[in-house]
């Protein structure tokens, strides 16, 4: 498991799943907050960036 992004107080962690040959993405290092999966680290970063921006946007919209 390795942290691939951190921004606005949010993190994205990636874990390589060798059997399926994908990266599983999580919002924490304990692999509790599942985000999705990606076939490459570049795709994982794109998905992670989108996830963080969505979380930040929702928090900003709700006044958090």
Model-derived segments and spans:
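Short N-terminal "domain-start" leader segments
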Residues: 1-22
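A short, exposed loop/beta-hairpin motif centered on an aromatic-Gly-Thr core
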Residues: 28-43
């Amino acid at each position: 498991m390795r942290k691939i992004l951190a921004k606005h107080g949010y993190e994205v962690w990636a874990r390589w799943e060798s059997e399926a040959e994908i990266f599983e993405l999580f919002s924490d290092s304990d692999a509790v907050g599942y985000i999705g999966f990606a076939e490459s680290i570049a795709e994982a970063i794109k998905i992670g960036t989108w996830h963080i921006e969505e979380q930040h946007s929702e928090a900003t919209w709700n006044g958090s």
